[in-house]
Amino acid sequence: MSEVTLKIEGLRKTYLAGTPGEVAVLRGVDLTLHAGEVVALVAPSGAGKSTLLQIAGLLDVADAGRVEIAGQDMAGARDRKRTRVRRQDVGFVYQFHHLLPEFSALENIVLPQLANGISQRDAEARGAELLALVGLETRAAHRPAALSGGEQQRVAFCRALANRPRLLLADEPTGNLDPATSDQVFEVLMQLVSETGLSALIATHNLELAARMDRVLHLEDGVLVER
């Protein structure tokens, strides 16, 4: 059995607890993700997909349950440890790329590496390597506004993988793209996962894309159901 990259047990999250507007979005979520595995997370808007990804990626905390990333138990972990694990072991991709508009494609990939203590030279080499993997080596000097939507999202993938994470969390990464571009970007994502051997949990409304992943998990009434 391959290494466990992400393990979640008994995750619970309620918003506005104790008020008339109380909403329990996660009601005991369990999930195990192995190295190299790509898993789809499917649910309607407002069902808790983003909340689950944020807790899994240490951007939010659950009311109950535990999260383990690459063998590191995050239960009760201090902010400093959570930040270190998030920077080193987790990569994020969102529906909207959130690239910094004043920086080039390459610079957008270099910056998170510098924040993680990587030298400028090594960060630029890693950025160039990733851009070449997604076919954008000739677009390295272009700012986001000069790139197409699909190109911007490919740069966002590269940025997410810049620090060589073990886990990629993607929230509707193709949701803002037309069908043809969405398919192309998804293929690039699968190529990157294959090249790096990381694990990926990908939230999507696109059932056709979901069916091409290793497993499909549906978030229903706050729990995960595999189909």
From Swiss-Prot:
What keywords tag this UniProt record? ATP-binding, Cell inner membrane, Cell membrane, Membrane, Nucleotide-binding, Translocase, Transport
Domain ABC transporter spans what residues? 6-227
User: Does the record bear ATP-binding in its keywords?
Assistant: yes
Gene3D superfamilies in UniProt: P-loop containing nucleotide triphosphate hydrolases
Reading the lineage from the top rank, the first entry is Bacteria
Its cellular-component GO annotations read: plasma membrane
- Please report a single Pfam family linked to this protein: ABC_tran
Q: Quaternary form?
A: The complex is composed of two ATP-binding proteins (LolD) and two transmembrane proteins (LolC and LolE).
What does the record give as the function of this protein? Part of the ABC transporter complex LolCDE involved in the translocation of mature outer membrane-directed lipoproteins, from the inner membrane to the periplasmic chaperone, LolA. Responsible for the formation of the LolA-lipoprotein complex in an ATP-dependent manner.
PANTHER family for the chain:
IMPORT ATP-BINDING PROTEIN, LIPOPROTEIN-RELEASING SYSTEM ATP-BINDING PROTEIN LOLD
Query: Could you tell me what this protein is called?
Result: Lipoprotein-releasing system ATP-binding protein LolD
Recorded name of the encoding gene: lolD
